[in-house]
């Protein structure tokens, strides 16, 4: 499993800026207002060939300068699973009582974890001198960094990753032969009921109260000679509804469950249909190149006739738009209708996700596709695709070698993707297509 590094500190010390700097992308909203809430809290990163997960615990500020119960819940729970902690303070404002409170709690509550003390915003020599006097927090050898400019960040990362175990394989999904399925969805859509129906036991507390399950819990299911790891999680709530503490922490666990899985089973409530939070979960899985299967649960509660499922499917496909390649199964955890069919479908998606197609078969496909539809000319020039191949990545990635990638039209790219799905069964799988000059 990839080690998890948590960024901890009071609001506005630069956690989101460091988060973006380390990941080399603008994943977090950076705002001078203390306590700005981001949409994404945990992302995969890589440094010098070592892979890890980075978590920003920012986003919630106490109402005063003392470490409130809310701050404890929101931050301390969020780092409970972290392998290392970067405790950040601000060189410009110096150590505050809140910094010292956080330092005290980190040492008392997380003494078994590796804690790295980072003094941020050290942007000039004078601030470096002032920062040297800030070691009274109790952490030795602080790292003087500038998250904005990158100063000192590389050395700190080198030291952190030197102390952490590296994954045995590049992809933690491959640690064993089991198929890892994340059971995802908003609170009270029936995730735990589905897992219990599959396992034949009330392994978890099942209640009508949303969010009964708080942590990601792994269960083993054996079926038709295959072993499945079912990762059941608390549902993702809209940010405005996340209770300080436990629900915030559960959302982070959900995001980490997506990192671990091969296929995401996204449950919808048949009586509510597809909502914005469902789309967020689906897009989160697609961004991480996971397989996706939609389960419309509680189908037994819907009044229906012979056309109900088709109408529901047509409406859902219209809402999904360009990700309409995701299969849909109508289930009932209560009656067990289609529950095992969902598992068998997810297994096929996982197998297809790792399929390796020979270059000769791919180029035969390419010639047939080009015979069906020729690329449109652009500015008097014609796109010429010479050949294609599959890139080994653990999920479908294809490279197309052509005379000029800038001549590619989106319509033609969508045509090739659709033909790939039809020819090689990539249902439920995001496909990455790279067009390279040759």
From Swiss-Prot:
SUPFAM superfamilies named among the record's database cross-references: P-loop containing nucleoside triphosphate hydrolases (SSF52540)
Lineage: superkingdom: Bacteria
Record-listed GTP 2 binding positions: 185-192, 232-236, 297-300
Family matches, as InterPro entries: G_ENGA, GTP-bd, GTPase_Der, KH_dom-like, KH_dom-like_a/b, P-loop_NTPase, Small_GTP-bd
Binding residues for GTP 1: 9-16, 56-60, 120-123
Domain EngA-type G, first and last residues per copy: 3-168, 179-354
Keyword GTP-binding annotated: yes
All copies of domain KH-like, residue ranges: 355-438
Keywords: GTP-binding, Nucleotide-binding, Repeat, Ribosome biogenesis
GO biological process: ribosome biogenesis
Pfam families, A to Z: KH_dom-like, MMR_HSR1
Molecular function per GO: GTP binding
SUBUNIT field: Associates with the 50S ribosomal subunit.
Protein function: GTPase that plays an essential role in the late steps of ribosome biogenesis.
Family assignment from sequence similarity: Belongs to the TRAFAC class TrmE-Era-EngA-EngB-Septin-like GTPase superfamily. EngA (Der) GTPase family.
PANTHER family the record matches: GTPASE DER
Protein name (record): GTPase Der
Organism: Chlorobaculum parvum (strain DSM 263 / NCIMB 8327) (Chlorobium vibrioforme subsp. thiosulfatophilum)
């Amino acid at each position: 499993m990839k080690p998890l590094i948590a960024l901890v500190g009071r609001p506005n010390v630069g956690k989101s800026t460091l988060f973006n700097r380390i990941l080399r992308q603008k994943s977090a909203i950076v705002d001078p207002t203390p306590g700005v809430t981001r949409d994404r809290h945990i992302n995969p990163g890589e440094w010098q060939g070592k892979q890890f997960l980075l978590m920003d615990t920012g986003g919630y500020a106490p109402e005063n300068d003392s470490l409130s119960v809310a701050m404890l819940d929101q931050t301390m729970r969020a780092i409970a699973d972290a392998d290392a902690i970067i405790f950040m303070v601000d060189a410009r404002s110096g150590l505050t009582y809140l910094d010292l409170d956080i330092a005290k709690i980190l040492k008392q509550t997380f003494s078994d974890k590796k804690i790295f003390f980072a003094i941020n915003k050290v942007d000039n020599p004078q601030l470096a001198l002032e920062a040297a006097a800030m070691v009274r927090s109790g952490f030795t050898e602080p790292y003087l960094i500038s998250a904005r400019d990158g100063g000192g960040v590389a050395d700190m990362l080198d030291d952190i990753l030197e102390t952490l175990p590296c994954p045995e394989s590049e992809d933690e999904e491959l640690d064993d032969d089991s198929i890892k399925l994340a059971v995802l969805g908003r609170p009270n859509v029936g995730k735990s009921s589905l897992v219990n129906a599959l396992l034949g036991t009330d392994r978890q507390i099942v209640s009508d109260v949303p969010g009964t399950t708080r942590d990601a819990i792994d269960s083993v299911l054996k079926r038709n000679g295959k072993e499945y790891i079912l990762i059941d999680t608390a549902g993702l709530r809209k940010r405005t509804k996340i209770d300080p503490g436990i629900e915030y922490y559960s959302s982070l666990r959900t995001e980490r469950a997506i990192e671990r899985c091969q296929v995401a089973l996204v449950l919808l409530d048949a009586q509510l249909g597809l909502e914005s939070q469902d789309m967020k979960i689906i897009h989160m899985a697609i961004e991480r190149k996971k397989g996706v299967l939609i389960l419309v649960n509680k189908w037994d509660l819907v009044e229906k006739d012979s056309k109900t499922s088709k109408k529901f499917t047509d409406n859902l496909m219209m809402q999904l738009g360009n990700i309409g390649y995701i299969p849909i199964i109508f289930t009932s955890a209560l009656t067990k209708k289609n529950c095992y069919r969902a598992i068998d479908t997810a297994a096929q998606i996982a197998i297809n996700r790792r399929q390796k197609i020979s270059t000769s078969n791919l180029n035969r496909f390419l010639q047939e596709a080009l015979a069906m539809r020729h690329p449109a000319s652009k500015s008097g020039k014609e796109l010429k695709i010479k050949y294609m191949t599959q890139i080994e990545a653990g999920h479908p990635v294809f490279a197309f070698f052509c005379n000029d990638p800038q001549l590619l039209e989106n319509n033609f790219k969508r045509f090739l993707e659709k033909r790939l799905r039809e020819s090689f069964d990539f249902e439920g799988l995001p496909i990455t297509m790279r067009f390279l000059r040759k």
